[in-house]
Amino acid sequence: KSLIPTLNKFFSKHDFKYKYFLGDAGFDAVDNYKYLYKDKNIIPIIPLRRAPSSPMPGFNENGVPTCPNDNKLLMKFDGITREKGRSDRIKWICPKSKKTRINGKTQYILTCENPCTTSKCGKIYQVPIDNNIRMHTVIPRNSSKWNNLYKTRTIIERTNFMMKYPLALQYTKLNNTESLKSEVILSAITQLIVVLIANNMNNTQNILSIKNIAI
């Protein structure tokens, strides 16, 4: 519940544009997805708080459609379809269909021995994001792109921790916003000084540790 008012306050003071929002499962709420994607044009990268016990028929627990003939085969993500006056749709193609360019034209080559459709390109499934904005994410969960983006979040968290560590801000009991902001800035300055000292000492492997440099 705190995300939307917090971001509204942030954007009212900062004219920044962001492409992705990386959050943990605590932000897994329909209102957050709607706010980020529809109101702010930001792609949410948020894991499910818990996988549905009974996934929608034809989909797996991450909202990815499966092959009608073999539910172990996941359909392949093929981008987002955007048309004026219509909801954005996630395009999925047959897992045994290969997208290629021939003579400057996009074509699909189907290699399935038991196709579920007479179409030469195999089954194509367009899923409106608005049908379930929480499950039908613009970047499919557990895809390589989704996982790589989410890894960035853990790197940022470690960086934030190390920025707070020199002044013990991870255990701060301050309630005053201005005082806390001042301590965070001082901590960032301290961390930068550590980096400069470590670099001058040719000891860059310890740039995040004042204790190790002192030793």
Placement of each model-derived feature along the sequence:
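A short acidic, amphipathic alpha-helical/loop segment
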Residues: D31-L36
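Short gly/pro/ser/thr-enriched loop/turn and capping motifs at secondary-structure boundaries
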Residues: R50-P55
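Long, low-complexity, polar/charged, intrinsically disordered or flexibly structured peripheral segments
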Residues: I93-V138
